[in-house]
């Protein structure tokens, strides 16, 4: 929790410094490159603090099967910049890979070898909807002297069974990795038996392998990690997204705006045109000073997060900068409030500032990260990359 506290303190300090620098710029009329470097990081810090690990987790030293799987899933779902692909078939906004906690070998019976794998499930707080649950496992194991054919099934301690069904009749399908791996859907099992429980739960699966040749006993499992033979995938959709408000005005306000718009065109056209011309002449060209989108890129290494964020290596939030003139052009898509604020500034009280240049449209970013407990998480964060700007 120390790292999480430090991140929160850094976020607050950065926010205070950003506001102080902004105030100084407004008074002195000077630009600051350092300010531009700080400002785009604020949204990402706020979003990722929720997923930040407590104790310094590290990236896996070896490129294991679980990490390979998630990297392939990420490659198919997002491009190298972290932008979600339009044709992605993942069907969810978040995928968590859960590694097994236990690796208990059961006495073998004949040619059968059994392991009980336990997968921890977090409490269901209603923030995310479980879309799908699958287990990815190796259905062919090639050891030093043995070839094994394997499959998985639910394990119930009170009702053990002596029946070892063949893997030919299961509902598994090929996984994203090699042909030695399969993926089996267990959504119904997880939803019915585990998902409605509020506390911590353990999903136990029985990993069963049949020898293809006569061999010794359990020594064939030595050196085989449980994470190398199976892992759990949980697919979620976010259920607490903000509700978009309808864009309309009361009828009286619409009439007021139409009347004021007509007055502006007839009574103040000359004054406004002169002001726009003077403003354009004062600065080095309206194209360079009017509200517009500016590219900006920062690496997660610069933020000190590269030890737990796997992909993408860079974040391109972009930012909006420029002057919002008294005549708001149509391309800015300014809201009705900005038009009213402009009217107040012109006709009522000039102490009310004109609208500011801010992002208008955003696109999400897909992030692949390692959680504190060692799970690997793919998650799409909405509203992370500015795509266009507006005055409001």
Swiss-Prot record:
Propiece residue ranges? 19-267
Q: Which PANTHER family match?
A: BONE MORPHOGENETIC PROTEIN 15, TGF-BETA FAMILY
Gene name of the encoded protein: BMP15
Modified positions (Pyrrolidone carboxylic acid) in chain numbering:
268
Q: What does the record list as GO biological process?
A: female gamete generation
| Location relative to the cell | Secreted
Identify the main location.
secreted
Q: Under which name does UniProt file this protein?
A: Bone morphogenetic protein 15
The keyword Phosphoprotein belongs to this UniProt entry's keyword annotation: yes
The entry's function note states: May be involved in follicular development. Oocyte-specific growth/differentiation factor that stimulates folliculogenesis and granulosa cell (GC) growth.
Glycosylated residues? 87, 147, 237, 277, 373
> Could you describe the subunit structure of this protein?
Homodimer. But, in contrast to other members of this family, cannot be disulfide-linked.
> Which Cys pairs does UniProt list as disulfide-bonded?
291-357, 320-389, 324-391
Coiled-coil ranges from the UniProt annotation: none
